[in-house]
């Protein structure tokens, strides 16, 4: 049934829709059979279709259209015959993904008069390959040729098993019918090839569209180019089908030193150099009413000369206008779609590229540009040209008409007769259109657990008296210069001498930096880094508790990488492997050794450090496995004289490390055992270590080991909101870190032990709330529960043990009892809550907190109350930045 009106078009769409629904269920084997049969039929009809196109449109050259028809069938088939376009495209068992292809549906194919048959063949074939249907809106000047090409492909497809109405067309095209087709509700995609007006109409239709537009291809010929090849290529391309290919050359810009040689070569090989009145006459016929004169499109050079009122030999290949102006006032500077060519002289390569940029911007932005140069010896020019040209195809030493369509002069450029121009040209794609653009891809993503890790120092030496033995490794590894980083107390009391004496005896030069204080500052760290830069150690030894080890780690970073920006190092991350800022590689200049003299921080085995900017008061918590020491020395002889308060605070810090690591969303079977063993050692030995001190060296040693074991656990499983809040309490009110954790941990357990939390932290392996069960497992492991106890009872017994332990270690019952004034606390609690939420530790907590919930925990802990869920709803949080903005808005109003 012919399509000549809206009703007939609607009926066609209905038939095509039915056919496409059937075709959408075909297998890859069936589709490939149809694709091959259709390509064979189109190739077989290449000559009659070419003759028909020229006869009907009055444009182009039969022999060249034969090549285009052959290309559209043979090259397209060869390029895509093995491409999977149906069903499962790929399956990745490792990452658990399946990619499935689905057809788009019905495509509206817009076909230009310049390439009426080859474009129809191309679009039909890629539609068939992707299980789509297509309805063509041909150009009125070439409708019969376009529709015949479509019919040949359709009949071959039907003979190979395709549904009978899979390809359709408008028999009597009009603007009304073309618009109706583009806007039809059953059209799923517009595939438009044509001039700017048609492409704009496609993109304005409200439908997904792939459209291409005008080209205004400039060619730069530099002084290193092979002139004979350059001229031959331009002539071959520009005369191909009388220049109707949109990628064909429109201007040549020649460097001055070879301009005359290029000019002479054109003149002696069929190029006609327009002189005087001839140039003006051709300029006058190129444009008509400010637009390209359709009368010259696809016409031979001698006919265009006749239109201009003069004659040239019939053998003339192209008309060349030597012009100077590079703007819209110059007709030769426009796209001409005919064997007419502008020729510009450039003073040098840079000037030539600048002119080419302007020509592209005038009317061919996004399409194609070309450079003739010595591509083997001028890579910088090739790169520069590529950077400057805003075109999707940048061809080197290539005839643009044949090169732009792909697979002829470069075999990785996809073959296509629809060339995307990207956003520059108002297109949605910037590559040569192919089957991949006509399918929807579905991704089936199976749940997969994150790859986890267990990272430790290369060596961990432990047991009483291990320090001098472990230092033998420094000597045997050939280190010659050791920088010891410690605090003044340890230095004055001879702890550093225990290291320097061993090293000096072996001929290792030593230097001691002992200015580290609690909460190390950037100024102190920079001072230590300056010493490192002058002393040039090949090993840095941190001696002390958390502060000297933190300072030493950061000095290590500054020594190895002085260009480091701490704001970037401290940037929060959701996944340490995907962080925006990548830590630099460490250990190039020096090895890091950590010798711990306290039992709590675990810093000797962790990738964490904290530094305070003393100019702003801003704390920078750093976390990266690059900061993990190369060696840890855990010698309990160094903690025998540790004061009771430090024993208590450090011990409860270690308890908190183990508790938070065990319930963390990153907890694994590798970290669980260490967390549980650390808790067992601490339960059995911390009271004795606190009460008996050096009189019970076994208890002191086991607590010391437990702190390091807990450090290993949280180095890999990370921590939670107890540490998030403790960091902020310590910073604001100068509460010792271990004490802050001890004050908060019971209420944090009450908060986390909820099987139906407000929000669960999103982490693949953490598939449901587990904290409640895991706290109960801790109680079981510590022997706190009895057979028959329910989960709630086990958690209460765990809390009872913690409260009893804290009481025995002299821990205050509340933040208020720890000496924080109520007015001061309440003035800062909102900011503390927000800052705790933003702490790096928060992300691994099993329960993703609301800021109001953190505020409630802080308030309850301040007053010594047990946290309960029901209290949270009444809590209002005033975020300082928001309050400030609201006040400013009211003031401005």
What is the predicted role of each segment?
Residues 88-229:
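Rossmann-like NAD(P) dinucleotide-binding subdomain of oxidoreductase/dehydrogenase enzymes
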Residues 260, 268, 605-717:
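Carboxylate- and glycine-rich phosphate/diphosphate-binding segment that chelates Mg2+/Mn2+
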Residues 452-539, 815:
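ATP/NTP phosphate-donor binding region
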């Amino acid at each position: 049934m012919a399509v000549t009106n809206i009703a007939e078009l609607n009926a066609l769409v209905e038939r095509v829709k039915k056919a496409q629904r059937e075709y959408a269920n075909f297998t890859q084997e069936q589709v490939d059979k149809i694709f091959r049969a259709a390509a064979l039929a189109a190739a077989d009809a290449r000559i009659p279709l070419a003759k028909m196109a020229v006869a009907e449109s009055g444009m182009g050259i039969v022999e060249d259209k034969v090549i285009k028809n052959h290309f559209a069938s043979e090259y397209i088939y060869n390029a895509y015959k093995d491409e999977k376009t149906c069903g499962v495209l790929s399956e990745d068992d490792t990452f658990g993904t399946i990619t499935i292809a689905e057809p788009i549906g019905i495509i509206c194919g817009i076909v230009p008069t310049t390439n009426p048959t080859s474009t129809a063949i191309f679009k039909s074939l890629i539609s068939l390959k992707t299980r789509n249907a297509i309805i063509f809106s041909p150009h009125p000047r070439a409708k019969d040729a376009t529709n015949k090409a479509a019919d040949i492909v359709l009949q071959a497809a039907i003979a190979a098993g395709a549904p009978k109405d899979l390809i359709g067309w408008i028999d009597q095209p009009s603007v009304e019918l073309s618009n109706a087709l583009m806007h039809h509700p059953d059209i799923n995609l517009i595939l438009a090839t044509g001039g700017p007006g048609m492409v704009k109409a496609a993109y304005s239709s409200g439908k997904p569209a792939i459209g291409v537009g005008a080209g205004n291809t400039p060619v730069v010929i530099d002084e290193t180019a092979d002139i004979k090849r350059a001229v031959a290529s331009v002539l071959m391309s520009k005369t191909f089908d009388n220049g109707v290919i949109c990628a064909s050359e429109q201007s040549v810009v020649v460097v001055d030193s070879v301009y005359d040689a290029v000019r002479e070569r054109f003149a002696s090989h069929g190029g006609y150099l327009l002189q005087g009145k001839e140039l003006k006459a051709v300029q006058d016929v190129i444009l008509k009413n400010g637009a390209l004169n359709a009368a010259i499109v696809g016409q031979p050079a001698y006919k265009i000369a006749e239109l201009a009122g003069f004659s040239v030999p019939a053998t003339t290949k192209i008309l060349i206008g030597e012009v100077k102006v590079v703007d819209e006032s110059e007709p030769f500077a426009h796209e001409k779609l005919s064997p007419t060519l502008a020729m510009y002289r450039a003073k040098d390569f840079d000037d030539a590229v600048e002119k080419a940029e302007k020509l592209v911007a005038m009317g061919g932005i996004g399409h194609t540009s070309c450079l003739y140069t010595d591509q083997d010896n001028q890579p910088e020019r090739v790169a520069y040209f590529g950077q400057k040209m805003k075109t999707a195809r940048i061809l080197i030493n290539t005839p643009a008409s044949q090169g732009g369509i792909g697979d002829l002069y470069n075999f990785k450029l996809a073959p296509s007769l629809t060339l995307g121009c990207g956003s520059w040209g108002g297109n949605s794609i910037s590559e040569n259109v192919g089957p991949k653009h006509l399918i929807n891809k579905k991704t089936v993503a199976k749940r997969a657990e994150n790859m986890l890790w267990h990272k430790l120092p290369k060596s961990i030496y432990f047991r009483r008296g291990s320090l001098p033995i472990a230092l033998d490794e420094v000597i045997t590894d050939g280190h010659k210069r050791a920088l010891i980083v410690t605090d003044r107390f340890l230095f004055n009391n001879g702890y550093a001498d225990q290291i320097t004496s061993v090293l000096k005896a072996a001929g290792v030069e030593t230097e001691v930096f002992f200015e580290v204080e609690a909460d190390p500052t950037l100024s102190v760290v920079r001072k230590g880094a300056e010493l490192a830069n002058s002393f040039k150690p090949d090993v840095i030894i941190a001696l002390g508790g958390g502060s000297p080890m933190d300072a030493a780690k950061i000095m290590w970073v500054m020594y190895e990488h002085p260009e480091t920006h701490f704001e970037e190092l401290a940037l929060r991350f959701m996944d340490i492997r995907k962080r925006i800022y990548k830590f630099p590689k460490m250990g190039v200049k020096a090895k890091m050794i950590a010798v711990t003299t306290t039992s709590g921080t675990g810093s000797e085995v962790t990738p964490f450090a904290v530094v305070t900017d003393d100019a702003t008061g801003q704390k920078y918590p750093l976390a990266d496995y690059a900061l993990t020491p190369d060696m840890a020395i855990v010698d309990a002889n160094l903690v025998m004289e540790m004061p009771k308060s430090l024993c208590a605070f450090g011990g409860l810090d270690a308890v908190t490390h183990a508790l938070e690591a065990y319930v963390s969303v990153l907890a694994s079977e590798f970290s669980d055992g260490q967390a549980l063993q650390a808790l067992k050692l601490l339960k059995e030995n911390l009271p004795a270590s606190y009460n008996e001190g050096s009189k019970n060296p076994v208890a002191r040693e086991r607590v010391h080991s437990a702190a390091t074991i807990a450090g290993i656990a949280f180095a890999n499983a990370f921590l939670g909101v107890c540490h998030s809040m403790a960091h902020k309490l310590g910073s604001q009110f100068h509460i010792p870190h271990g004490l802050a954790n001890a004050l908060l941990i019971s209420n944090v357990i009450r908060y986390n032990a909820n099987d139906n939390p407000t929000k669960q932290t999103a982490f693949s392996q953490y598939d449901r709330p587990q904290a409640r069960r895991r706290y109960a497992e801790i109680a079981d492991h510590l022997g706190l529960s009895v057979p028959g106890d329910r989960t709630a009872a086990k958690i209460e017994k765990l809390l009872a043990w913690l409260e009893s332990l804290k009481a025995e270690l002299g821990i205050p019952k509340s933040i208020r009892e720890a000496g924080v004034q109520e007015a001061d606390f309440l003035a800062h609690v909102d900011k503390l809550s927000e800052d705790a939420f933003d702490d790096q530790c928060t992300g691994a907590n099993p329960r993703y907190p609301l800021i109001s919930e953190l505020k409630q925990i802080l308030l309850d802990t301040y007053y010594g109350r047990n946290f309960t869920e029901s209290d949270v709803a009444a809590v209002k949080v005033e975020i300082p930045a928001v309050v400030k903005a609201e006040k400013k808005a009211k003031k401005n109003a």
